[in-house]
Amino acid sequence: MPRIVTRGIKKEDVKELSTVLLDTIETIIDRPKSAFTLEAVEATSYFDGEEAPLVYVEVSWKARPTEVCKEVAEAITPLIKDKGYEKVFVYFKELDLEKEFTL
């Protein structure tokens, strides 16, 4: 159940990117995109009293090799940059599925 959370991207852009973004990750990790969630958190970063146009993409999923994480980051970054965002930070969090519950 990969969970992708974006920050610093307009929700309209996330909506437009959603199909290609999830299709890309689906292909790389060989998991159906129906198992993914994609969220857009509207946020603004600041540096020295000015807005800093930074984008963060957090991918939470079960442990995967660093090479797979790098491949995903390298595949999705240009998709986001094509929307006009210059700095994109992609990071990964490992979920402990034994401690995840749906009640």
Where are each of the predicted segments found?
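Interaction-mediating elements
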Residues: 1-103
